[in-house]
Amino acid sequence: MARLIPNVEIDRIYPISEQKVARALVEQLPQDCVIYHSYPWLHSNTHSGNPPQKTLYEGEIDFVILWPEHGLLVLEVKGGKIDYREEERDWYSTNQQGETNRIKDPFAQASKNIYAIKKLLEKKQYSSQNIPFTYGYAVCFSGSRYRGGVPPGSEPSIILDMNHLPKIKSSLQSIFNHWNHASSQRSITPADRKKVDQILLPEFKLIPVLSSQIEDQEADLVRMSEDQLHILDMVKSNSRMAIE
């Protein structure tokens, strides 16, 4: 059974489309796998100018799958009835109430998200070398069955649907093989696993500085003195008051 981060009950995951995928991943993948759900990212790009300008970009990834034996995979999930309209090159989702809304291209989202993870890994650890393990992305339509041709920017080998959920382990193994550009599978070594864990889930600490602690203590003393003066005033005005 894989480990889910954050450590929440799967029944509390929303939307249901992601809950189904989370359950399949946690129950079927091995114990050394880590599944990051709703992983947020933020990175900056520098644009030319005088002076150069930095712009922040943000996003959220449905699932980041860290499987040491095979690599790292970003998984974008779409639920409900999904349609791609070729003449418009747009994607649409229809909910249970029959309401249809245009949505973002899931393959473009997944591609953008793996690029963000790649940039994060390169910035923190792998700036002077290629990332030494397999990484890629896939899209899962957890409430639909896939049929027909594939839209531009996609590939059958990185598409999952509801039929893949009962066998998601073997399906993901196949996807990793398609993203592997080396002659043999590039797994994540224990050393790299430690680095990736520290990058994706860094330890965040706030340590009070001494001057701040002194200021807090002085403020407490002032409050105590004010309280004591207030009590003395009350005692003076009420001779029958007792203080324990």
Task: For each feature predicted by the language model, list its residue ranges.
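Glycine-rich phosphate-binding P-loop
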Residues: 228-229, 243
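Walker A/P-loop
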Residues: 237-244
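Intrinsically disordered, low-complexity Ser/Thr/Pro/Gly-rich regulatory segments
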Residues: 1-223, 229, 234
